Amino acid sequence: MKTFPDDFLWGGAVAANQVEGAYLEEGKGLSTSDVQPQGVFGPVVERVAGDSGIKDVAIDFYHRYPEDIKLFAEMGFSCLRVSIAWTRIFPNGDEQQPNEAGLAFYDRLFDELAAHNITPLVTLSHYEMPWGLVKQYGGWGSRQTIGFFERYARTVFARYREKVKLWLTFNEINMSLHAPMTGVGLPETSSKGEVYQAIHHQLVASALAVKACHEIIPDARIGNMLLGGLMYPLTCKPEDVLETLQENRAWQFFGDVQCRGAYPGYMQRFFRDSGIQLEVTDADREALKSTVDFISFSYYMTGCVTADEALNQQARGNILNMVPNPHLASSEWGWQIDPIGLRTLLNVLWDRYQKPLFIVENGLGAKDKPDANGVVQDDYRISYLNDHLVQVREAIDDGVEVMGYTSWGPIDLVSASKAELSKRYGFIYVDRDDSGNGTLARSRKKSFYWYKEVIATKGASLKD
C-alpha cells in the first residue's frame, strides 16, 4: 500500500480576488481584478458609483472565513494557500503607511487557520495589483513599481513573521505573456518588448522579496509560482520537437531566472532575434541572485506543439494557443485531462532545478448540480483528482521531492479566466450563480468525503 510522506502538506488553494468579496470594505483600494469584470482575458471596465460585479461579493469569504476554515479542517487540511490582496494593505499602492484594517483582517485569518492547525501558504500577488499603480505609473512597466512592491512585501513579512512561514511571490508569473493586464498591468496592445521589460521588473521585485523574506523571517521558505504549461511535440518530426523545446522554454525561463539567478542564454538569443533591448542594471543583476527556496506550480492540462502553421492557426484562441492532443479527453471548458503529464512535469522540474516542488493548483472545473437531496454527486471530480494524485505518488517514488498538494478551489469560487461561478471546482458547494443570485450557503459535495479519506489515509485510499 503506497502512501504519501508523513510531512506531506494536504489542502486547497484560493485567491483573495476570487473568494473574499468585500471589495471596497475597510479601506481597500481598487485592484486590476476589480476593473476586469469578465476575467483575466476580459476588457478593462472603469468602475462607477453604484455598479457591481460578481467578484465584489464573490463567495463572501471575507465575512465567512471562520465557517469555511472549519469545513477545511473537517476534511483534514494541513495547509491552505491564500493570497493577500495588495490593495487591502496599500490601497493605491504608493502610500507610505499601510492600511491597518487590512493588516488586521489577515491577522484574524491566519489566527483562525492556526486554531485549526492549518499551515498558511501565502501568495503576495495573485492576479491583481493596485489599479492606482497602473493608472498613475504604468503598472510593472514602471521601475518604480519594484519599490512599491518591496515596501508591501516587507510590510507583510514583518507583520506576519510569527504566523506565516511559507510564502510565494507572484502567481503564475508566466501568464503575463498571455494576459498582460492581469500579469503586469499593461494593456493588451503592448509590444512584446514592453511586456518583457515589465516582466523583468517583476522578476527583480520577486528576487528582492525573497531577499527580504530571508532577512525578516529567517526560518521561512519562499517560492515562485509557475503556470505548469508542459507541451508535447504533436509528431516526432524534428521541427516539431525543436518547436516544443522553444515553447516549453517560454515558460521555463521564469523558473530559470528565479531558481538560478540569471537570464539563460536561450533568452538572450530570443531578445536579440526579436529586436528587444531590455534595460537591465547591475543592481538588477545582483538582485536576481536571490533565488527561491522551492518551486510551486499549477497544473491543469498539457498541449501539443507543431511547426505546421496551418494547424497552429486553428489552435489560436484557446487558453495558451495549444494544438489539441488526439489521445486525451477534455473538460467542459476544453481543457485536456492528462494525469500522467503531472508526473512528467514533476520530473522535468526536479531534473531541471533540484529544488523542492509544491503543486499549489490542480482541479476540475465543472457545472455541478445538486441532486434531489441537495448533494452534488461529483464522481467526475473524484476520478480526476484521484488519477492526478496517483501520478504525484509515482513522481515521489521516482525520487522527486514534493512538499505538498493544494487542490484549486476547495470551495466553489469565481473562476479567473471568465469570472464565472458556474465553473465550480470545490469540495464545498456555494449557493450562488453567475448572476449573483443565491443564499451563499455552503454544503458538502461527495468529493468532500472522498478527499477527507484520502488525507486521513495519506493517500492509501487512492485507486490505481
Residue spans for each PLM region:
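Aromatic-lined carbohydrate-binding/catalytic grooves of carbohydrate-active enzymes
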Residues: M75-G102, V122
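Active-site region of glycoside hydrolase catalytic domains
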Residues: M1-A49, N92-D94, L103-D464
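Active-site mouth loops of central-metabolism enzymes
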Residues: G50-R64, G141-Q144
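Catalytic domains of carbohydrate-active enzymes, especially glycoside hydrolases
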Residues: D60, R64-A85, S290, F294
